[in-house]
Amino acid sequence: MTKPVIIGIAGGTGSGKSTIANAIQENVQQEITVITQDSYYKSFDNLPLEERHKINYDHPVSLDNELLISHLQTLKNNVPIEMPTYDFETHLRNKKTLTKNPSKIIIVEGILIFENPQLRNLMDIKIFVDTDADIRILRRIERDIQERGRNLHSILKQYRETVRPMHIEFVEPSKKYADVIIPEGGHNKIGIDMIVTKILSIMED
C-alpha cells in the first residue's frame, strides 16, 4: 500500500473545518480517515474539576501533540491506531478509544495543527479555513450548548478570556503556513474543487 496523503485543515473555532473535511470526502469519493485534534487534549486527572475548568484549552500546551504526531506517523506507515476520546464536560480523556484504520487520505483538523512544526511537516496539503469572527462565535455557541453541555455565560466568558486572545496569538499567525486559504467558512465551491483536483493529482503520482 502506498503512503497516504495527509491533509491538514486549520482555522479558528467554528470556522468550518468539518464542512471542508466533509466536502473533500464527498468529492474525492475515496475512503478517508479523519483525525480531530480536539480528541488529543491532555487528561488533567490529577486536578479537581474546578481547577480543570480554569485551564486554557486554547493554548498549545493543553494538547498532547506528541501522541497526535505518533499516531499520524503510525497511520502513515499503514498501521491502525486507537484514537482517544475526550469528555468536554469533565475535561478528562475517556477510557473508550476509537479505532482508526489507515486509508489513502488522512485528514487531521484542529485550530492549532499548524502551530506545531513537527505536526506541520507530516502534512502534504495544508488548508486554512478563514471565517469572520462573528460567524465563528455564533457557531461555537450553538455547538457548545448542543454538544458539550455548556451554558451561554461560560461560553462567552471563555471566548473573551482565552478563545479570542489565543486565536490572535496562535491561530491567526499560523495561517502563513497554509498552502491554501479558503474564505467564506468552508462554503467556497471553487476552492474545494481546486483542493480535490490537487489531492487526486498527488494520489496519481
Predicted regions and their residues:
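NTP-dependent small-molecule kinase module
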Residues: N101-P102, E142, R164-D205
